[in-house]
């Protein structure tokens, strides 16, 4: 959500920001609707004062035994006008609807661009492997090994679902444990286990609603299946005012995520790159306004560290204004090398939302200055570290062997108890 006072202070700056995000000029309309609303509220306050004055006059006249029928009629008329105006103000949601539909303002360093072709590479890490044999895509390897079953998943659920078996299911569990251990034991994150069914207010608070109404799954009793742990983790501080010395708060969670993938027809129709349900380890930070820049760099470096320890080649991309998420002010994408596709693919996105989500959530922190208490909105950040399905796909493709087996990265072997993934003989019917 946006601060109207900042929009009014520099409408040209706000318009440039919205244009860069593909939304066109918006400031004039916002200011016009705000003036209308303020005018109506001013009129409402005036009418209430008039009614109160007439009510006092009626009481005085009655005590004095003086006829007051005209004043009583005037009071009734004012009450009707007040009720009509109150209803009109309550029903007029044009301003709030407009503000809710607009994305966050990009940071000054964010490159202006329409789509991912305008993203900027910041750095890369790792050496791409030279294969002496034909590279197989992860979905082909998984089916060869009898460990990845898309056909049976389609029978159970439909398209864009998968079943992992045996060593591949163990690898999934190993990755989640490895990532959570690293985040909690080395980097000070608090692990959270949270509901995956959330109410619509919780989704609204982080910017998932109303803009992306069709992108999440909705139950018949108006719950939503959370598309990311960010939804729950950020909302842990909704409606609170925290002491400054309690920040930063850092949360991590492994959860199943659910996405409708609206508008993705024809994209990544095979494999584990784009699914309706997938596991992900998420990082969320709640911090102060002066510390959020450094917190984003820290969070991004932690996500990178996961890839470094897995020895997967990757690059870091600074997203352009047109490719960022709705609530983000600045985002880095980590893209892992997928040899079978001969290109980098997103495996993590780390974003600073500044006070955009906090304004919706009513999340603040307080501090004392010159013995006076002050409060201001927190800054929220989120990052995936990492998406488990895509990490499995990357390991399968980068660590594949000519015989179809897959070498397990060294860092995971204490979790798997094995050094390689071999073919499973226990086929499902």
From Swiss-Prot:
Its EC number is 6.1.1.11. SUPFAM superfamilies: Class II aaRS and biotin synthetases, tRNA-binding arm. Signal peptide: none annotated. Pfam families: Seryl_tRNA_N, tRNA-synt_2b. It is an enzyme of class 6 (ligase). It catalyses: tRNA(Ser) + L-serine + ATP = L-seryl-tRNA(Ser) + AMP + diphosphate + H(+); tRNA(Sec) + L-serine + ATP = L-seryl-tRNA(Sec) + AMP + diphosphate + H(+). Its main location: cytoplasm. ATP binds at residues 259-261, 346-349. The keyword Lipoprotein does not apply. The keyword ATP-binding applies. Consists of two distinct domains, a catalytic core and a N-terminal extension that is involved in tRNA binding. One of its GO terms (biological process) is selenocysteine biosynthetic process. It is found in: Cytoplasm. One of its GO terms (cellular component) is cytoplasm. This is Serine--tRNA ligase. Disulfide bonds: none annotated.
């Amino acid at each position: 959500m946006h601060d109207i006072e900042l929009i009014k202070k520099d409408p040209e700056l706000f318009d440039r920001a919205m244009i860069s995000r593909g939304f066109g000029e918006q400031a004039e309309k916002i200011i016009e609707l705000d003036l209308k609303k303020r005018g109506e509220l001013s009129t409402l306050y005036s009418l209430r004062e008039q009614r109160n004055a007439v009510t006092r006059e009626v009481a005085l006249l009655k005590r004095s035994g003086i006829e007051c029928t005209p004043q009583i009629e005037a009071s009734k008329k004012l009450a009707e006008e007040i009720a009509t105006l109150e209803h009109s103000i309550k029903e007029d949601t044009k301003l709030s609807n407009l503000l809710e539909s607009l994305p966050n303002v990009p940071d000054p360093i964010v490159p202006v661009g329409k789509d991912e072709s305008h993203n900027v590479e910041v750095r890369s890490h790792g050496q791409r492997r030279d294969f002496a044999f034909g590279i197989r895509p992860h979905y082909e390897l998984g089916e060869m090994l009898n460990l990845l079953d898309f056909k049976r998943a389609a029978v159970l659920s439909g398209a864009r679902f998968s079943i992992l078996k045996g060593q591949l299911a163990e690898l999934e569990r190993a990755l989640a444990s490895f990532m959570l251990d690293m985040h909690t034991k080395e980097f000070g994150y608090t692990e959270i286990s949270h509901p995956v069914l959330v109410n619509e207010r919780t989704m609204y608070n982080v910017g998932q609603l109303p803009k992306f109404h069709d992108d999440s799954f909705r139950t018949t009793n108006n719950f939503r299946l959370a598309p990311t742990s960010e939804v729950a983790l950020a909302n842990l501080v909704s409606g609170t005012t925290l002491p400054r010395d309690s920040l930063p708060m850092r949360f991590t969670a492994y959860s199943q995520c659910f996405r409708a993938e609206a508008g993705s027809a024809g994209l990544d129709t095979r494999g584990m790159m784009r699914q309706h349900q997938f596991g992900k380890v998420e990082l969320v930070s709640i911090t102060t306004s002066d510390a959020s820049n450094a917190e984003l760099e820290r969070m991004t470096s932690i996500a990178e560290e996961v890839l470094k320890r897995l020895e997967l080649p990757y690059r870091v991309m600074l997203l352009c204004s047109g490719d960022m998420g709705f609530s983000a002010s600045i985002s880095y994408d980590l893209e892992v090398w997928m040899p079978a596709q001969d290109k980098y693919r997103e495996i993590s996105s780390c974003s600073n939302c500044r006070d955009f989500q906090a304004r919706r959530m009513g999340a603040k922190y307080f501090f004392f200055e010159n013995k006076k208490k002050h409060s201001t909105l927190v800054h929220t950040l989120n990052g995936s570290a990492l998406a488990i399905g895509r990490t499995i796909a990357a390991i399968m493709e980068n660590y594949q062997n000519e015989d179809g087996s897959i070498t397990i990265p060294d860092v995971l072997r204490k979790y798997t108890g094995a050094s390689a993934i071999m073919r499973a003989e226990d086929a499902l019917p």
